[in-house]
Regions:
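Membrane-interface "cap" regions at the ends of multi-pass membrane proteins
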Residues: 1-28, 57-62, 66-79, 83-90, ...
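Inter-helical loop and helix-membrane interface segments of multi-pass membrane transporters/permeases
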Residues: 2-5, 32-37, 67, 72-91, ...
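Membrane-embedded translocation segments of transport machinery
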Residues: 2-3, 7, 11, 167, ...
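Extracellular loop-to-transmembrane helix junctions
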Residues: 5, 34-60, 142-143, 389-393
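Loop-to-transmembrane helix boundary motifs in multi-pass membrane proteins
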Residues: 6, 11-13, 20, 144-145, ...
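Transmembrane helix-boundary motif of multi-pass solute transporters/channels
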Residues: 12-47, 236, 247-250, 254-257, ...
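Hydrophobic transmembrane alpha-helices that form the core helical bundles
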Residues: 54-71, 86-132, 316-333, 391, ...
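C-terminal membrane-solvent junction of multi-pass transporters and transport-like membrane proteins
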Residues: 88-91, 337-350, 382-440
Length: 451
């Protein structure tokens, strides 16, 4: 089976873990929510939610993962001194597998659009761009091949191990992602009328803040950091005893939020320069933004071409940093529990997630009715993980660490065995015992329309 491996540097820890949090949601969800819900007012509320929920949630998974130095399922059972607790970690692993299956479909769309941008395939009037996406997404072959191809690309990184695969890739992908983002932000903000978009994103409008906005900010803080997927727990199992958990968690939150805000500066200035009101989700990046870039840089077609290519390259990088972490969660559990090689474990994970991806891809129009409860299979997978599995795993994690695990173990991990200040430990313990579980419960009820 071989050794588990570990991250070789502090930078590797930060970039790899931040990469797991940074994904397509930073581009297609956060900017739209901020712009629609009070701009800077929403961002401020979001930061408060990060403190109330995000940081305690990350720290909880970090502590469980590092203490056990094993896969997520074994981490919970070892710390809880009972195999039944391993179910919590197993739920996280299953969640990550399902998410990787449907996430790879959208990531595959990004690959197709990167290729199409390079050859000029998505250049045309708004109706053409819309039809292009609908036709492609409903095709039975191409999107499915791209999805499986993306999982294989992810596999190629994960199979090389923690230090030679995940860490090395993160040290390349994350800086490159940031550079591409900054280049597009500069180009977007230089357009005529771009400042209207900047104002839309950053002008604080507290009149828009209501109960719903507060709950949306809580939800964004929860989902943006990959809580409840066993990702943070798995990555923390590769941390050294010298890793300052609170400092690392804070740095990761800053990177994740910074990239989300920069994504807003990439989207809104360009959109407002041509009088387009951006939406969210896949339609934003596959229909709205191709039209926006064509119109905004219409007088500079070469620049428009470059920006389009860079944008989809950016999306591919953002998706890949996320899929690497999702793949590693299942791979680690499979090869450790079955006592096989990492390569064999990675292949089992790849094949399993590819099967899920095929069903998700075909449900987008190629096979009408492929799904349940009036929803397509991809949406079913999304709802099942986001509305049920992730909140369930997270709330149990907080209660498990806050009430069941011996306080001394939690304190020792929090303070790196007394080498780091423990002044905030009582605050952390209060958060995971009371505040974070209540916040997660509110998110759960809000998703089902109860509140």
């Amino acid at each position: 089976m071989g050794s588990r491996g570990n991250f070789g540097s502090k930078l590797g820890v930060i970039l790899a873990t931040a990469g797991s949090a940074v994904g397509l949601g930073n581009v297609w969800r956060f900017p739209y929510m901020a712009g629609q819900n009070g701009g800077a007012a929403f961002i401020l509320i979001y930061l408060v939610c990060i403190i109330l929920l995000g940081l305690p949630g990350m720290m909880s998974e970090f502590i469980i993962g590092r203490h056990s130095a094993s896969n997520a399922a074994r981490a919970y059972s070892n710390l809880g001194k009972n195999k039944a607790w391993g179910t919590v970690g197993l739920v996280g692993v299953i969640t990550s597998m399902i998410i990787l299956g449907f996430y790879a479909v959208v990531a595959g769309w990004c690959l197709q659009y990167l290729y199409a941008s390079i050859i000029g395939g998505v250049h045309g009037d708004p109706e053409y761009v819309k039809t292009y996406f609908q036709t492609f997404a409903s095709d039975p072959i191409r999107p499915t091949l791209w999805a499986v191809g993306f999982i294989l690309l992810t596999h190629a990184v994960v199979v090389r191990g923690v230090r030679n695969g995940i860490e090395k890739a993160s040290k390349i992908l994350m800086p490159l992602l940031f550079v591409l983002l900054v280049v597009i932000v500069i180009a977007s903000c230089s357009l005529p009328g771009a400042m209207k978009g900047v104002q839309f994103l950053f002008h604080p409008d507290f009149s828009k803040v209501d109960e719903n906005v507060l709950l949306e900010a809580l939800g964004q803080a929860f989902f943006s950091l990959s809580l409840g997927t066993a990702c943070l727990c798995t990555y923390a199992s590769y941390f050294s005893r010298q890793t300052n958990l609170l400092k690392s968690a804070s740095q990761i939150v800053v990177i994740d939020t910074l990239i989300a805000v920069l994504a807003g500066l990439m989207i809104f200035p360009a959109a407002f320069s041509v009088g387009v009101q951006p939406d969210s989700g896949p339609s934003l990046i596959f229909i709205t933004l191709p039209n926006v870039f064509q119109q905004a840089f219409g007088d500079m077609p070469v620049v428009g071409y470059i920006i389009s290519v860079l944008f989809y390259a950016l999306l591919v990088l953002a998706a890949l940093t996320s899929t690497i972490s999702m793949h590693e969660i299942g791979t680690a559990m499979i090869y450790e529990e079955r006592k096989i090689t990492r390569a064999k474990g990675a292949w089992i994970e790849t094949i399993t997630c590819s099967i899920i991806a095929v069903f998700c891809s075909l449900s987008q129009g190629a096979v009408p009715g492929l799904g349940f409860f009036g929803k397509d299979f991809l949406t079913n997978c999304d709802n099942f993980t986001a509305q049920l599995l992730m909140p369930l795993a997270s709330i149990v994690t907080c209660l498990f660490l806050g009430w069941y695990v011996p306080k001394k173990i939690v304190r020792d991990e929090f303070t790196n065995w007394g080498t780091v200040s423990g002044k905030l430990f009582p605050v952390f313990l209060f958060m995971i015992r009371f505040v974070s579980p209540i916040c997660i419960l509110l998110i759960f009820l809000h998703q089902f329309g109860v509140i």
